């Protein structure tokens, strides 16, 4: 189901006073959200803690009322509808399973609260529960209690419970945060499989950049309640629109530079070829280079020369800090250099990304 957010804003009254003032401006948790969520896709809401992503999720499900704007599910305006009438399922980091009920009864619980024309017979409920349990691969655990399950199994129960009512959209608020790294990665793959098999629109809140890039069809990057960029994981990583996105998504070297003309930029006292155009002449810009795009070469062969200040083994690569005259670069390489060694740095034009200074993250 397609979801459309039209100029969605949520303000909260400020509490207390500051330096003797009795009144403070309202806190804007979500500011002018205006974008469309395609039908049957997994959308990641990504941003640091306190950026408004959970507030946005609560607006979509109806737990909060927007201060301004509208929410459409398909062609239906659901802005004023309560959560139970929106056809949404929710999964939280806290699984909230009933400890005294079996897995089967936990999954069945929301079906027992259906009323009127939606009420199901016992046979229909049992069928729905079994289908949901099979989908998340826990149909062999239906007679167990939550305390007899692992963390990953408990998470699957919570997902099955959210899916058993056949929601139009599933909202997930950092559901894997309590799991260890290996299990979290396994569940990322599992959630993507479930989404693709059901065709339900998933909206997934996370502050984990790798998680968002791994799972999402499209990523919405947020900061201070404002959408910074919407795009595919590849676009978000390779073509960040501002310094905040570049710095928040993965690691970045962000250097002050001057765009001399199309495809030519100056930074760190040297002139480099790049592929960007349309910035005008002699325009101050931010230059973004990913650590993995910098290559360490012999000192005399690099456009930049520097000294290796530190080296850390990260498992798949070494992370080195190379101090040049103008900037200390982070470099990722599969080959380690010794601390104190003078090296050269090279980068190809395609890996030099240019952005306007005025396009930095809004605060």
Regions found by a protein language model. Name each.
Residues 67-70, 224, 256:
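Conserved coupling/switch loops of ABC nucleotide-binding domains, chiefly the family-specific signature
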Residues 4, 36, 72, 344-346:
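ABC ATPase nucleotide-binding domain
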Residues 61:
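Helix-to-loop junction immediately C-terminal to a conserved catalytic motif
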Residues 46-48:
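The feature captures the beta-strand-to-loop junction immediately N-terminal to the Walker
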Residues 69-77:
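Conserved ABC transporter NBD signature motif
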Residues 252, 263-363:
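Non-catalytic connector elements of ABC transporters
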Residues 87, 93, 97-244:
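ABC ATPase nucleotide-binding domains
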């Amino acid at each position: 189901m397609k979801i459309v957010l039209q100029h969605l804003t949520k303000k909260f009254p400020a509490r207390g006073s500051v330096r003797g003032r009795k009144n403070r401006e309202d806190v804007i948790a979500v500011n002018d959200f205006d974008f469309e969520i395609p039908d049957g896709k997994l959308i990641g809401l990504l941003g640091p803690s306190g950026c408004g992503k959970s507030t946005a999720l609560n607006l979509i499900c109806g737990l909060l009322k927007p201060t301004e704007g509208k929410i459409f599910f398909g062609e239906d305006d659901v802005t004023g509808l309560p959560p139970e009438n929106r056809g949404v399922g929710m999964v939280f980091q806290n699984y909230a399973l009933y400890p005294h009920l079996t897995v089967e009864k936990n999954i069945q619980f929301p079906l027992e609260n259906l009323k009127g024309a939606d009420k199901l017979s016992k046979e229909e409920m049992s069928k729905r529960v079994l289908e949901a349990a099979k989908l998340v691969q826990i149909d062999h655990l239906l007679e167990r209690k939550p305390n007899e399950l692992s963390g990953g199994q408990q998470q699957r129960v919570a997902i099955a419970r959210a899916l058993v009512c056949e929601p139009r959209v599933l909202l997930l608020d950092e559901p894997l945060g309590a799991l260890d790294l290996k299990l979290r990665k396994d569940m990322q793959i599992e959630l993507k499989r479930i989404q693709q098999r059901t065709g339900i629109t998933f909206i997934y809140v996370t502050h984990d950049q790798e998680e968002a890039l791994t799972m999402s069809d499209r990523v919405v990057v947020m900061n201070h309640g404002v959408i910074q960029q919407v795009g595919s994981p590849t676009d978000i990583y390779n073509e960040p629109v501002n310094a905040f996105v570049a710095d928040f998504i993965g690691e970045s070297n962000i250097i002050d530079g001057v765009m001399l003309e199309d495809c030519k930029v100056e930074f760190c006292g040297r002139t480099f070829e790049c592929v960007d155009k349309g910035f005008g002449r002699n325009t101050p810009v931010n230059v973004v280079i990913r650590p993995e795009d910098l290559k360490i070469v012999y000192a005399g062969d690099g456009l930049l020369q520097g000294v290796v200040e530190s080296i850390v083994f990260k498992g798949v690569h070494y992370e080195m800090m190379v101090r040049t005259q103008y900037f200390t670069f982070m470099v990722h390489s599969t080959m380690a250099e010794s601390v104190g060694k003078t090296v050269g740095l090279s980068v190809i034009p395609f890996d030099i990304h240019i952005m306007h200074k005025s396009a930095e993250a809004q605060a």
